[in-house]
């Protein structure tokens, strides 16, 4: 069974340009922006934690343009089985870093390499 297309989750307009650059690298990926803080996202959401947890439970690869700690704390209660994790990455808002967080068996390192190459940087 194939995974859904990746979700690029952003918290503010400052991340939108980087999110769109990543989206160009990943056919079918969508940009999800925080309602009231992001204009021009493909879809909006109102609660970061609920949204990221729902994406994770739906096996959707997650590319979060925010601090890695926010993503880790959000998903910590759901981390049960390493083999069943979708890829989860944190990307710096300014496109200076790509950090694979979860989903080593699910292709997170390959996804990190694709994104990093497209942004002209090395993955962490």
PLM regions and their residue ranges:
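N-terminal basic/disordered segments at the start of proteins
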Residues: 2-37
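Short, surface-exposed linear patches
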Residues: 30-32, 84-87, 110-114
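Alpha-helical scaffold segments in soluble metabolic enzymes
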Residues: 17, 21, 54, 73-77, ...
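Short, glycine-/small-residue-rich phosphate/pyrophosphate-handling segment
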Residues: 96-124
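N-terminal beta-loop-helix "entrance" segment that forms/cooperates
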Residues: 30-55
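Glycine/small-residue-rich interface belts in oligomeric ring/scaffold proteins
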Residues: 44, 51-102, 107
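Weak global preference for isoleucine
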Residues: 8-10, 22, 62-63, 70-72, ...
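Generic secondary-structure signature for well-ordered alpha-helical cores
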Residues: 24-28, 61, 80, 84, ...
